[in-house]
Protein backbone atom coordinates (compact mmCIF):
# COMPACT_ATOMS: atom_id res chain seq x y z
CA UNK A 1 0.00 0.00 0.00
CA UNK A 2 1.49 3.34 -1.04
CA UNK A 3 1.51 6.46 1.11
CA UNK A 4 -1.58 8.63 1.27
CA UNK A 5 -2.05 12.38 1.45
CA UNK A 6 -2.92 11.98 5.13
CA UNK A 7 0.35 10.13 5.72
CA UNK A 8 2.24 13.17 4.43
CA UNK A 9 0.18 15.54 6.57
CA UNK A 10 0.83 13.34 9.59
CA UNK A 11 4.58 13.50 8.99
CA UNK A 12 4.54 17.20 9.87
CA UNK A 13 2.49 16.50 12.97
CA UNK A 14 5.07 13.89 13.94
CA UNK A 15 7.93 16.29 13.14
CA UNK A 16 9.29 13.94 10.47
CA UNK A 17 10.80 15.48 7.35
CA UNK A 18 9.23 14.65 3.97
CA UNK A 19 11.52 13.52 1.14
CA UNK A 20 10.28 14.40 -2.34
CA UNK A 21 11.90 13.55 -5.66
CA UNK A 22 10.88 14.93 -9.03
CA UNK A 23 11.05 12.21 -11.66
CA UNK A 24 9.52 11.42 -15.00
CA UNK A 25 10.29 7.88 -16.14
CA UNK A 26 9.70 4.29 -15.06
CA UNK A 27 13.35 3.31 -14.58
CA UNK A 28 14.46 6.10 -12.25
CA UNK A 29 11.09 6.27 -10.48
CA UNK A 30 11.44 2.57 -9.64
CA UNK A 31 14.77 3.27 -7.96
CA UNK A 32 13.39 6.28 -6.08
CA UNK A 33 10.49 4.20 -4.81
CA UNK A 34 12.83 1.39 -3.80
CA UNK A 35 14.90 3.91 -1.82
CA UNK A 36 11.85 4.80 0.27
CA UNK A 37 11.27 8.33 -1.05
CA UNK A 38 8.03 9.65 0.46
CA UNK A 39 6.64 11.55 -2.53
CA UNK A 40 7.28 11.19 -6.25
CA UNK A 41 6.51 14.43 -8.07
CA UNK A 42 5.98 14.32 -11.83
CA UNK A 43 6.99 17.89 -12.57
CA UNK A 44 6.41 19.92 -15.70
CA UNK A 45 10.18 20.40 -15.59
CA UNK A 46 10.03 17.21 -17.68
CA UNK A 47 9.76 19.64 -20.56
CA UNK A 48 13.36 20.72 -20.03
CA UNK A 49 14.92 17.58 -18.57
CA UNK A 50 13.24 14.98 -20.77
CA UNK A 51 12.10 16.88 -23.88
CA UNK A 52 14.78 19.56 -24.24
CA UNK A 53 12.52 22.62 -24.05
CA UNK A 54 13.96 25.92 -22.85
CA UNK A 55 11.33 26.19 -20.11
CA UNK A 56 8.10 24.59 -18.89
CA UNK A 57 5.74 26.69 -21.01
CA UNK A 58 5.36 24.29 -24.00
CA UNK A 59 4.49 21.24 -21.86
CA UNK A 60 1.05 19.79 -22.67
CA UNK A 61 -1.51 17.82 -20.70
CA UNK A 62 -0.95 14.80 -22.94
CA UNK A 63 2.76 14.88 -22.12
CA UNK A 64 2.11 15.21 -18.39
CA UNK A 65 -0.32 12.29 -18.51
CA UNK A 66 2.26 10.17 -20.33
CA UNK A 67 4.98 10.88 -17.75
CA UNK A 68 2.51 10.36 -14.90
CA UNK A 69 1.46 6.98 -16.28
CA UNK A 70 5.10 5.89 -16.51
CA UNK A 71 5.89 6.88 -12.92
CA UNK A 72 2.65 5.38 -11.60
CA UNK A 73 3.69 1.98 -12.97
CA UNK A 74 6.94 2.25 -11.04
CA UNK A 75 5.78 3.22 -7.58
CA UNK A 76 4.61 0.87 -4.89
CA UNK A 77 5.22 2.94 -1.76
CA UNK A 78 5.42 6.68 -2.49
CA UNK A 79 2.63 9.22 -2.84
CA UNK A 80 2.41 10.36 -6.47
CA UNK A 81 1.78 14.04 -7.25
CA UNK A 82 1.63 15.44 -10.80
CA UNK A 83 1.98 19.01 -12.05
CA UNK A 84 -0.77 20.77 -13.94
CA UNK A 85 1.08 22.38 -16.87
CA UNK A 86 0.85 25.98 -18.08
CA UNK A 87 -2.67 27.05 -19.13
CA UNK A 88 -4.26 23.77 -18.08
CA UNK A 89 -5.89 25.42 -15.05
CA UNK A 90 -5.57 29.20 -15.34
CA UNK A 91 -8.32 29.92 -17.89
CA UNK A 92 -11.26 28.48 -15.97
CA UNK A 93 -12.19 26.41 -12.96
CA UNK A 94 -13.80 23.91 -15.32
CA UNK A 95 -10.48 23.44 -17.13
CA UNK A 96 -8.71 23.02 -13.80
CA UNK A 97 -11.09 20.33 -12.59
CA UNK A 98 -11.16 18.44 -15.89
CA UNK A 99 -7.39 18.45 -16.30
CA UNK A 100 -6.83 17.49 -12.67
CA UNK A 101 -9.09 14.52 -13.32
CA UNK A 102 -6.97 13.50 -16.30
CA UNK A 103 -3.86 13.34 -14.11
CA UNK A 104 -5.70 11.30 -11.48
CA UNK A 105 -6.85 8.88 -14.19
CA UNK A 106 -3.21 8.68 -15.34
CA UNK A 107 -2.23 7.43 -11.89
CA UNK A 108 -1.58 10.50 -9.73
CA UNK A 109 -2.86 10.68 -6.15
CA UNK A 110 -2.82 14.49 -6.15
CA UNK A 111 -2.05 17.44 -8.40
CA UNK A 112 0.21 20.46 -7.96
CA UNK A 113 -0.43 23.91 -9.34
CA UNK A 114 1.34 27.24 -9.14
CA UNK A 115 -0.11 30.44 -7.73
CA UNK A 116 -0.92 32.21 -4.51
CA UNK A 117 -4.11 33.89 -3.37
CA UNK A 118 -5.32 34.33 -6.93
CA UNK A 119 -5.60 30.55 -7.31
CA UNK A 120 -7.40 29.91 -4.00
CA UNK A 121 -10.86 29.64 -5.57
CA UNK A 122 -9.59 27.22 -8.22
CA UNK A 123 -7.85 25.08 -5.62
CA UNK A 124 -10.96 24.98 -3.48
CA UNK A 125 -13.03 23.81 -6.45
CA UNK A 126 -10.58 21.01 -7.26
CA UNK A 127 -10.48 19.89 -3.63
CA UNK A 128 -14.29 19.98 -3.47
CA UNK A 129 -14.53 17.31 -6.19
CA UNK A 130 -12.24 15.06 -4.17
CA UNK A 131 -8.83 15.70 -5.74
CA UNK A 132 -6.01 16.59 -3.30
CA UNK A 133 -3.92 19.62 -4.24
CA UNK A 134 -0.35 20.66 -3.45
CA UNK A 135 0.13 24.41 -3.74
CA UNK A 136 3.23 26.12 -5.12
CA UNK A 137 4.29 29.66 -4.22
CA UNK A 138 7.48 31.69 -4.35
CA UNK A 139 9.19 31.40 -7.70
CA UNK A 140 6.58 30.10 -10.14
CA UNK A 141 8.35 28.96 -13.32
CA UNK A 142 5.18 29.03 -15.44
CA UNK A 143 4.57 32.74 -14.82
CA UNK A 144 7.24 34.61 -12.85
CA UNK A 145 9.94 33.32 -15.15
CA UNK A 146 8.22 35.18 -18.00
CA UNK A 147 8.16 38.51 -16.17
CA UNK A 148 10.66 38.56 -13.31
CA UNK A 149 13.28 35.99 -14.17
CA UNK A 150 15.00 33.57 -11.83
CA UNK A 151 14.97 35.59 -8.60
CA UNK A 152 14.74 34.72 -4.92
CA UNK A 153 11.33 35.58 -3.50
CA UNK A 154 10.53 37.14 -0.12
CA UNK A 155 13.56 39.34 0.39
CA UNK A 156 11.55 42.46 1.28
CA UNK A 157 8.93 42.97 3.98
CA UNK A 158 6.14 43.50 1.47
CA UNK A 159 6.97 40.47 -0.66
CA UNK A 160 7.36 38.37 2.49
CA UNK A 161 3.95 39.44 3.77
CA UNK A 162 2.41 38.54 0.41
CA UNK A 163 3.94 35.06 0.53
CA UNK A 164 2.69 34.51 4.07
CA UNK A 165 -0.78 35.64 3.03
CA UNK A 166 -0.64 33.37 -0.03
CA UNK A 167 0.25 30.39 2.14
CA UNK A 168 -2.60 31.09 4.56
CA UNK A 169 -5.14 31.41 1.75
CA UNK A 170 -3.93 28.23 0.07
CA UNK A 171 -4.34 26.38 3.35
CA UNK A 172 -7.85 27.79 3.75
CA UNK A 173 -8.58 26.61 0.20
CA UNK A 174 -7.70 23.07 1.24
CA UNK A 175 -4.19 22.27 0.02
CA UNK A 176 -2.56 19.34 1.80
CA UNK A 177 0.95 20.70 1.19
CA UNK A 178 2.71 23.77 -0.19
CA UNK A 179 5.88 23.87 -2.28
CA UNK A 180 8.05 26.91 -1.53
CA UNK A 181 10.41 27.63 -4.41
CA UNK A 182 13.38 29.95 -3.95
CA UNK A 183 11.84 31.69 -0.95
CA UNK A 184 14.27 33.32 1.49
CA UNK A 185 14.91 30.84 4.28
CA UNK A 186 13.62 33.22 6.96
CA UNK A 187 10.25 33.61 5.26
CA UNK A 188 10.07 29.89 4.50
CA UNK A 189 10.54 29.20 8.21
CA UNK A 190 7.80 31.65 9.16
CA UNK A 191 5.40 30.06 6.66
CA UNK A 192 6.28 26.57 7.87
CA UNK A 193 5.53 27.62 11.44
CA UNK A 194 2.33 29.43 10.45
CA UNK A 195 0.46 26.85 8.36
CA UNK A 196 -0.39 23.28 9.31
CA UNK A 197 0.11 21.98 5.77
CA UNK A 198 3.61 20.54 5.24
CA UNK A 199 5.91 22.88 3.31
CA UNK A 200 8.24 21.39 0.71
CA UNK A 201 11.35 23.43 0.06
CA UNK A 202 12.87 24.03 -3.35
CA UNK A 203 15.87 26.15 -2.47
CA UNK A 204 14.06 27.62 0.53
CA UNK A 205 16.22 26.52 3.42
CA UNK A 206 16.40 23.79 6.01
CA UNK A 207 13.35 24.78 8.05
CA UNK A 208 10.74 23.61 5.55
CA UNK A 209 8.88 20.44 6.47
CA UNK A 210 10.37 18.59 3.52
CA UNK A 211 12.68 19.00 0.56
CA UNK A 212 12.51 18.20 -3.14
CA UNK A 213 15.17 17.66 -5.79
CA UNK A 214 14.97 16.62 -9.42
CA UNK A 215 16.46 13.13 -9.60
CA UNK A 216 18.63 14.05 -12.59
CA UNK A 217 20.08 16.98 -10.62
CA UNK A 218 20.72 14.79 -7.59
CA UNK A 219 22.51 12.18 -9.72
CA UNK A 220 24.44 14.72 -11.81
CA UNK A 221 22.80 13.74 -15.08
CA UNK A 222 21.51 17.14 -16.26
CA UNK A 223 24.07 19.86 -16.95
CA UNK A 224 22.07 22.49 -18.83
CA UNK A 225 20.95 24.20 -15.62
CA UNK A 226 22.81 23.93 -12.31
CA UNK A 227 20.71 25.65 -9.63
CA UNK A 228 22.49 26.66 -6.43
CA UNK A 229 20.00 24.72 -4.31
CA UNK A 230 20.45 21.40 -6.12
CA UNK A 231 22.95 19.25 -4.23
CA UNK A 232 24.72 16.69 -6.39
CA UNK A 233 25.22 13.38 -4.65
CA UNK A 234 27.19 11.99 -7.59
CA UNK A 235 28.28 13.02 -11.08
CA UNK A 236 26.69 10.24 -13.06
CA UNK A 237 26.92 12.05 -16.39
CA UNK A 238 30.71 11.56 -16.42
CA UNK A 239 30.33 7.85 -15.72
CA UNK A 240 27.66 7.50 -18.40
CA UNK A 241 29.75 9.28 -21.04
CA UNK A 242 32.80 7.17 -20.11
CA UNK A 243 30.75 3.97 -20.41
CA UNK A 244 29.43 5.01 -23.81
CA UNK A 245 32.95 5.83 -24.99
CA UNK A 246 34.10 2.39 -23.80
CA UNK A 247 31.24 0.77 -25.71
CA UNK A 248 32.12 2.69 -28.88
CA UNK A 249 35.76 1.60 -28.57
CA UNK A 250 34.74 -2.03 -28.03
CA UNK A 251 32.60 -1.98 -31.17
CA UNK A 252 35.35 -0.39 -33.24
CA UNK A 253 37.98 -2.85 -31.95
CA UNK A 254 35.61 -5.81 -32.40
CA UNK A 255 35.83 -6.80 -28.73
CA UNK A 256 32.08 -6.46 -28.28
CA UNK A 257 30.16 -8.63 -28.43
CA UNK A 258 32.25 -11.34 -26.79
CA UNK A 259 31.34 -15.03 -26.74
CA UNK A 260 29.31 -14.64 -23.54
CA UNK A 261 27.12 -12.08 -25.33
CA UNK A 262 25.98 -14.21 -28.28
CA UNK A 263 24.04 -17.40 -28.97
CA UNK A 264 25.18 -20.54 -30.83
CA UNK A 265 23.60 -23.27 -32.92
CA UNK A 266 23.78 -26.93 -32.05
CA UNK A 267 27.10 -28.09 -33.60
CA UNK A 268 25.43 -30.94 -35.49
CA UNK A 269 22.80 -28.62 -36.90
CA UNK A 270 25.50 -26.17 -37.94
CA UNK A 271 27.35 -28.99 -39.73
CA UNK A 272 24.18 -29.91 -41.64
CA UNK A 273 23.61 -26.28 -42.56
CA UNK A 274 27.13 -25.85 -43.89
CA UNK A 275 26.84 -29.02 -45.95
CA UNK A 276 23.57 -27.82 -47.45
CA UNK A 277 24.82 -24.36 -48.40
CA UNK A 278 28.21 -25.73 -49.48
CA UNK A 279 30.38 -23.70 -47.17
Swiss-Prot record:
Transmembrane segments: none annotated. Pathway: Cofactor biosynthesis; coenzyme A biosynthesis. InterPro entries: Pantoate_hydroxy_MeTrfase (IPR003700), Pyrv/PenolPyrv_kinase-like_dom (IPR015813), Pyrv_kinase-like_dom_sf (IPR040442). It is found in: Cytoplasm. Mg(2+) binds at residues 44, 83, 114. GO terms for molecular function: 3-methyl-2-oxobutanoate hydroxymethyltransferase activity; magnesium ion binding. SUPFAM superfamilies: Phosphoenolpyruvate/pyruvate domain (SSF51621). It comes from the Archaea. Keywords: Coenzyme A biosynthesis, Cytoplasm, Magnesium, Metal-binding, Transferase. Pfam families: Pantoate_transf. The active site is at 181 (proton acceptor). Signal peptide: none annotated. Its cofactor is Mg(2+). It catalyses: 3-methyl-2-oxobutanoate + (6R)-5,10-methylene-5,6,7,8-tetrahydrofolate + H2O = 2-dehydropantoate + (6S)-5,6,7,8-tetrahydrofolate. GO terms for biological process: coenzyme A biosynthetic process; pantothenate biosynthetic process. 3-methyl-2-oxobutanoate binds at residues 44-45, 83, 112. Binds 1 Mg(2+) ion per subunit. One of its GO terms (cellular component) is cytoplasm. Its EC number is 2.1.2.11. Catalyzes the reversible reaction in which hydroxymethyl group from 5,10-methylenetetrahydrofolate is transferred onto alpha-ketoisovalerate to form ketopantoate. Belongs to the PanB family. Homodecamer; pentamer of dimers. This is 3-methyl-2-oxobutanoate hydroxymethyltransferase. The gene is panB.
Amino acid sequence: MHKSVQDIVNMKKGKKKVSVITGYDYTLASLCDKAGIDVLLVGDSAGMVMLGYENTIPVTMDQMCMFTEAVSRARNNALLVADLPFMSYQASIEDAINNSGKLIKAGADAVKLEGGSIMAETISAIVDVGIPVMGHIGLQPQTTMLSQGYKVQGRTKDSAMQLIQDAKELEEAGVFSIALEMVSHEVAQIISETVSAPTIGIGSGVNCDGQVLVVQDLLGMYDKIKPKFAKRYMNLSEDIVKSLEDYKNDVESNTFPAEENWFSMDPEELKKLREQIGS
